[in-house]
Amino acid sequence: MYSNNMYIITGASDNHYLTLMNMIDSFIKYNDRHKLIIYNLGLEETKWNNIKEKYSKQDFIFKIFDYSKYPEWFNINIEAGQYAWKPTIIYNTFLEYTDEILVWMDAGNLINENLQKLETFLINNYIYSATSNGTIKDWTHPLTIQYLNCKNIENENRNGACMGFNTKIGFVKDFITEFYNCAKDKNCIAPEGSSRKNHRQDQAVFTILFYKYLYEQNKTCYSNDHGKYNLCHSIHNDIESHWDK
């Protein structure tokens, strides 16, 4: 059972230029029918033009993230914009490509096989994200936990490097909308006193919502071993220096 195609979304600023091209090349190597949306998150004009020229024969969708529409703290050059641009891009893509399967992939990811396993998982389970180190309590600021009224703080973290959404499903639409609404509110995604030392911004919010919506729907894919691993990809293959270092 297959969807017509999935929309894979990625992007980068200047410090992930080479890393982004590495990810794009891996997509080309293993892709047979899915779409790739590439966001300019702060690439200088020469680099952006180089990417568009290099992949001009591919059927890619090129977009520039318009920071002017959002609060100043979205600026990717200041504390990585608190990663608020990521759920915002997912939401905007959802509005443009309604009822499709959407997958965010960080530029540091590498696709290492065709995406059939990931697609099948999303058709059957609706939301995908592998596990990450620690728990909600370990990597979520208490004010975000309070804001989202999270009670299950011992749950495993999910990984924000790859997040998949089957937007044909009603509660997934609600999930994406709440994810975006939280990203717009700094008190939710990056409250006072939070930093990368004690909080994981978009990943922290995604994790809380992941369990909230799956519990409400009585879905148990979070306990499915298949859903704990990086399906069809690896993460943290950055060539340039990473923001967290």
Indicate where each model-derived feature is located:
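Glycosyltransferase catalytic domains, chiefly GT-A lineage
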Residues: M1-K245
